[in-house]
Amino acid sequence: DIANRIDEELENKDAKEILKVIGNYSKALDLLDDYDHRTLVKPKGNDSKKRIKYDDCLDIISKLKFNEKSDIFAIEKDRGLEAIIGDIYLTFDGNDVYKSVEEKASNFLYMIVKNHVFVDGNKRIAATMFIYFLNFYDILYKDGKQVIDNNALASLTLMIAESNPKEKEVIIDLIMNFLS
């Protein structure tokens, strides 16, 4: 743990207080360290046989306030969202390709952002669908707190948008770690 290593070297009270605050962010710092060294571990996650439905997703998207600001917001291209929903539930040889709910959720967010399945609003729709997905599977909250806060959701969505597709697996692992 990064904060504990630094703590051994510091003696004064102010430094120890600062490290106490930094210690509250040890999970984030450890994730950054693992990301830098490409040693992120994919958490096991949860299983579920429930499935989100394409029509339910479209219903939620149609009610987004962003629809009022643009004539092209949420116009779907070639039923791309339906294809993504099919992709996250793919099986091979009787086993789910994406094993856990968290892995499905992470890929759902990633694919909506990267595949640009809407004329306008891909990032906003992706973030909304991610929240819906987490809530649908009862993993949006842990111990009464959001597992992904507003800033983290915006940051993850933008990170995906700006990322190189070659980085997909490490980004998926990072998102899954946020959810665990």
Question: What spans do the regions from the language model cover?
Answer:
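FIC/Doc superfamily catalytic core
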Residues: 1-180
